[in-house]
Amino acid sequence: MGPLGRETWAQRLGTFRASPSAFMAGPEGEDLGRDLLSDLRSEKLSEPMKVALLALSLEYPDQLWPDAPAAEAAATSLLDTLVLLPPRPSALRRPLLLAATTALAAGGALNPASGASGRLLPLLLGLASGRDLGRSFCPASEQRPLQATAWECLRELESCRPGLLGGCLGLLRALLGREGPAQPLSLLLALALRNALVIQARAGAGLQGLLTAGESSMEGGPWNWMLAEEGEVHLQPQAPSWPAAEEDECGLAALELSPEEARELRATVAQLLDASYLLTPVAQAQLLWLLGWALRGLRGQPPVLFKPQLVRLLGTAQLTLLHAMLALKAAFGEALFTAQDEALLLRRLTLAAQHPALPLPTHLFYLHCLLNFPENWPLGPTGEEAAPLLLGSQLCRGLLPSLLHEPMALLARLHLLCLLCVEDEEKEGKGQDRSPRHYLEELLAGLRQRAALDGGPRALATLCFQASYLVAHCLAGQPVVLIPLTQGLAQLYRARPALAPHFVDLLDHVGPELQEPLRVALRQEVASRPGREEALRWHLQMLASVADGDAQSATLSFLRAAAAHCTDWGLQQALLRVCRALLRAGVGGGLADLLQELARQLEDPDGQDHARLYYILLAHLAGPKLGVALGPSLAAPALASSLVAENQGFAAALMVQEAPAPIRLSVGPRRAEGAVPVLRLQVEVLEPVYSLELRFRVEGQLYAPLGAVHVPCLCPGRPTRPLLLPLQPRRPAPARLAVRALYSTPSGLTCHAHLPPLLVAFADLFLPFPQPPEGAQLDFFEELWDSCLPKGTESRLWCPLGPEGLEALVSRHLEPFVVVAQPPVSYLVAIRLPPDSRLLLRLEAAQADGVPVALRTDDWAVLPLAGDYLRGLSAAG
């Protein structure tokens, strides 16, 4: 097949980028790499298109060259294409060099036996050293850009095979002196130096003249494959943290350097540092990190070499350089930073973090630096979290958290406040006004007050519990803080029981200092307040988490009172989960009576079976065996008896098991008819399902409880009628329906599964008004229009139209609700919104791109929903 055209390649590249894995698995995937390499030599494709093809090979080398032989062949072809380029200027030389390097590195083909490696490495070194390769290879105008690209390629290869350029250190050092402070060359030399030091230290050898060896003294070429084999562990040039001190002691500290090698090493580091100010901030930070790691723990190499850089960097506004400076401080401590330097740096971080115009990421960075500030002489055990000694409450007064801050900034400031509370514990005992602890208690009270708002955003509740966890983690040893925190959380649950899932999650993650008193407080709160019926499921969920052997009589009394209100399957299961928790806690006689009552009282057969099972287990098993029977199941042991196997299978058949749902449920097209809105549900199954029961729960209190939908049998491939789900909105607003399915399988098992939630849109609630008599439509609409005021509200907006115009839009979305129509420019629309609201629309004087809409409603809450609906009609099509 001949070369592909530009349009064909553009289509293939677009399809590939949309889903690389799917494209490579298709019929064209196998030929993509071969066609790419072939068409790079075609004269029919323009250079920009060829550059796009090379960019693809740089982004997805793993998909194009999945193994070492394919990568070797690709690199060879790319080098051949590079050599065959005409001597005129071309935009392909640099991408070809990068693509060949990427293919070898990503495909694992970089080794001494690779022919492509043997061709690429001398070429890169020749370009990097500025050697004249002849005008037939490239014009003089491209030599400087190609030299910078060669440096980048060599740095990539050194990153992939640490130690590969160990034999080139002397050459790179001489080249740096000749070329000046070129950024890629400086980073290449620093990386190669760091890797050589680490690998030689692990081998217990010195530098062996690597820093002074020139190109002429290299035997067998400049590539140190032996050193690269010893450095098989890929050292990351931008690791997020310094090596541990133990690694240094058994690593770089073991490197034996002769006086001449130590002198040459200091000269090389000084040469790199002296010109580092000419590099970009990111490159400077990387250079400092590499050299700091190279010298940390190395005997005979004083960190004073970095001192001139500190004088320059202490006043920097670049975050990357500030981070590198803190990394140097963590590495060398008081050997490099005096107490005055530490105080200056700490004060600068504190003042910078208080700047009101800082973006949130920058503000969080400064706070992170303060929270993890590396002190010269930290007090306390290693690894213990504490505020810096010089960071007092007066200096941090502007960093105290406030309810007005962003959540992430508030939590970071709260973390700092907790550390200050630990430091200022002694001062609080002396009657200090407005101590950090008092401020902390006021802040937590404000967070709880916002979280207690009924119907408030979930983010406020989440923030409150995140802050509570942070305080419990940082101040676990201070009862003076934990006692009011426990009381405040109990009051929060009393005000808003719907936060029970947050409380359960908090109890699972906090330590015993807060966990035990909070469990007791919440158990007392639940037992003393049975609550209304809608809060009962939250009380039962909380009690299942906090119930234990204490306060048995109060807990059992609450359960007996709650059993009368557990009328549906979900509440009954929640009640039985509490009984299971009490069983595991070893509660005895009173629980047996309760289980017998539940076996007679519960209406659902599944609940009755569970109650009888728990009663039998309680009556026949001792405490340890009962805990094992009710605990999480381990790997199933081999069954030695067929009777045991049969009994286990019988028990499994009686239990309702959770399983992945073989059911797909979706909302079908709506029909505006009847007295209440009805969702038409489309259901599909992947396997036969019998006695299907779909249970729906509305998130929030927007709708009245929904009834279950029953289907006797569903089989895959058979058409099914839509399932009708009547809705009873308490307010005309969209909602999410949580869906749970209970069904039987062909094997006789009863299973339950959670289905994806269904969304009830605002338009799903639309109902038409009764049809007025013929000829009275306009009077009927005007009467409705006038009746909306003064109780309701009126608004006007612009509704954009698609290319089909107003008549098509009304026909598609508003046809059942049109009272008066004068197509194609004017329509009067009346919509009834349950339970007792109305929405009236005047669409008049339509223009080509839109129509002005006047709307009235007798319910203020409907106005923003109606505006969003009308503005989205043209996009809905």
UniProtKB/Swiss-Prot annotation:
Domain of life: Eukaryota
Gene encoding the protein: AP5B1
Free-text function comment from the UniProt entry: As part of AP-5, a probable fifth adaptor protein complex, it may be involved in endosomal transport.
Protein's name according to its UniProt entry: AP-5 complex subunit beta-1
Keyword annotations from UniProtKB, A to Z: Protein transport, Transport
GO cellular component: AP-type membrane coat adaptor complex
Keyword check for Transport: yes
GO biological process: endosomal transport; protein transport
Transmembrane intervals: none
Subunit structure: Probably part of the adaptor protein complex 5 (AP-5), a tetramer composed of AP5B1, AP5M1, AP5S1 and AP5Z1. Interacts with ZFYVE26 and SPG11.
Entry keyword Transport: yes
